[in-house]
Amino acid sequence: MGNNVVVLGTQWGDEGKGKIVDLLTEDAKYVVRYQGGHNAGHTLVIDGQKTVLHLIPSGILRNNVKCIIGNGVVLSPEALIKEMSGLEDRGVPVRERLFISEACPLILPYHVALDQAREAARGKKAIGTTGRGIGPAYEDKVARRGLRVGDLFDMASFAEKLQEVMAFHNFQLEHFYKVEPVSYEAVLEQAKGYAELLTSMVIDVTNELDAARKRGDKIMFEGAQGTLLDIDHGTYPYVTSSNTTAGGVAAGSGFGPRHLGYILGIAKAYCTRVGAGPFPTELFDEVGDHLGTKGHEFGATTGRKRRCGWFDAVAMRRAIQINSVTGFCLTKLDVLDGLKEIKICTGYQMPDGSIAEVSPMAADAFENVTPIFETMPGWSETTFGAKTLAELPQTALDYIKRIEELTGVPVDIISTGPDRNETIIKVHPFSA
């Protein structure tokens, strides 16, 4: 299938991508983030030690891996430096292995102020953003007024551009949202403080990755959030501000799309969602509470409680269409241990009585569907920490097989716990 693997979420994010990227990068030379920002929360557990990464690619804990932040990522210098410091305090040589595209848009304090002011103004209609400035930074990029990492090479020009964009945003903050403006002088001084560090990490990402491809190096592209949060294909407007799908890889890194190989879709054995937006299989009973408690379903970035529900094969089919998913990694199978019965959503009944086999695009249409469930027997045995299929109960194997039948895509990897070695690999993406 080739040396270039994409790992992305096929639900509403929080599927367990970080662990899988860390696991598979034993064989990789590069790990590339291509979209999102520090609104991502990728949790790794290695020999019992927990690491949460928000911006730096999950391959950073591997000595053999170069990590790249591509142009599709909106970069908060403050968040990056904090994350780097935490890793360096543990002896991880981040500066030797982390590289940045000069085309990365910068997230600056006025983006955060705007994000939070807007969410407050929306009241009950709030989207549920992380409040970290992601959306406003992407807006500035599209409006062609955003500042980028490359602008830090010329601080005189940077200061001039900053003054112009801050005048625009501070007017909104003061006169529309009725909150305090952000200090231009403070932001400029901040930028001067991290300019040298950021510019020292800049490389020509497209050239680097193309050279790596020609050498035959293994490259992994690490997605953030999930397909159903994609700005174009997700449950709009309850979405993130970037393209979280496989199509975002080329645009967000400059890597030629023809060279992409295996697309690994990450999916929980059930579904979760953080914040507002439609969620057809959501559970409001003790089973939902059980999934949330046993699965430790609290956001790595925000700490917010995640909503929990049954596995949704209908939404999954849409994710497969969009991403050309080669194979799945099914995570958190062990969370289903002990349930007497398990349900899978196999179709949506639409308001007109018709049955949909793939999910609708818009949030309004999503809100009006009635999920159709198939009930399967659960299992009392533990699957936690299983490393071979032989260790799984037959009913768990039947559940996995049914997901494969309903989606038409094989489950190639099964995660049975948070540690990197608590995994069953049927097919390795780099060997497929």
Swiss-Prot record:
Family: Belongs to the adenylosuccinate synthetase family.
GO cellular component: cytoplasm
Pathway(s) this gene product operates in, as recorded in its UniProt entry: Purine metabolism; AMP biosynthesis via de novo pathway; AMP from IMP: step 1/2
Top-level taxon of origin: Bacteria
Binding positions for substrate per the UniProt entry: 300-306
Record-linked SUPFAM superfamilies: P-loop containing nucleoside triphosphate hydrolases
Alphabetical list of InterPro entries matching this protein: Adenylosuccin_syn_GTP-bd, Adenylosuccin_syn_Lys_AS, Adenylosuccinate_synth_dom1, Adenylosuccinate_synth_dom2, Adenylosuccinate_synth_dom3, Adenylosuccinate_synthetase, P-loop_NTPase
Main location: cytoplasm
Record: residues binding GTP: 13-19, 41-43, 306, 332-334, 415-417
A Pfam cross-reference name: Adenylsucc_synt
UniProt: IMP binding residues: 14-17, 39-42, 130, 144, 225, 240, 304
PANTHER family: ADENYLOSUCCINATE SYNTHETASE
Swiss-Prot/TrEMBL keywords: Cytoplasm, GTP-binding, Ligase, Magnesium, Metal-binding, Nucleotide-binding, Purine biosynthesis
Enzyme's top EC category: ligase
Location in the cell: Cytoplasm
Species of origin: Vibrio cholerae serotype O1 (strain ATCC 39315 / El Tor Inaba N16961)
Reactions this protein catalyses: IMP + L-aspartate + GTP = N(6)-(1,2-dicarboxyethyl)-AMP + GDP + phosphate + 2 H(+)
Cofactors (names): Mg(2+)
Assembly, per entry: Homodimer.
NCBIfam families the record matches: PRK01117.1, purA
Physiological role: Plays an important role in the de novo pathway of purine nucleotide biosynthesis. Catalyzes the first committed step in the biosynthesis of AMP from IMP.
GO process terms (BP): 'de novo' AMP biosynthetic process; IMP metabolic process
Protein name, as recorded: Adenylosuccinate synthetase
Coiled-coil ranges from the UniProt annotation: none
Residues noted as binding Mg(2+) in the record, renumbered to the chain: 14, 41
Molecular function as annotated in GO: adenylosuccinate synthase activity; GTP binding; magnesium ion binding
